[in-house]
């Protein structure tokens, strides 16, 4: 799918809203409660977009977003923590033209 397709089919606005919500949900790697919050948020987004909530598992004390075999055609491999300590990034979310800046915008 090209960026033109994203705009053409009306997906750009909800995609950007989801990305912004994930970025604004600060989740430093070592803050397990904050990581749980971002995993719950990702599950809420998945439920809205795909109609299927993720199972949230705890593996070695860390929250994991898991679909299992419910959507075998989808592979999502990512990290959801924004890594940086709370308040490290200012502004947390910034859009200038077609450039978005913030923790995790490239790989969330």
Regions from the language model: what does each represent?
Residues 2-104:
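Acidic/His- and Gly-rich active-site-bordering loop/insert found
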Residues 108:
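DPxDG-like acidic metal-binding loop motif
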């Amino acid at each position: 799918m090209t960026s033109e397709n994203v705009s053409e089919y009306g997906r750009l606005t909800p995609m950007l809203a989801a990305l912004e919500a994930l970025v604004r949900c600060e989740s430093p790697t070592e803050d397990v409660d904050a990581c749980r919050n971002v995993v719950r948020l990702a599950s809420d987004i998945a439920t809205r977009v795909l109609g299927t909530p993720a199972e949230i598992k705890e593996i070695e004390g860390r929250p994991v977003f898991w679909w299992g075999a419910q959507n075998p055609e989808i592979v999502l491999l990512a990290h959801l923590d924004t890594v940086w300590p709370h308040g490290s990034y200012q502004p947390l979310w910034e859009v200038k033209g077609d450039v978005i800046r913030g923790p995790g915008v490239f790989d969330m």
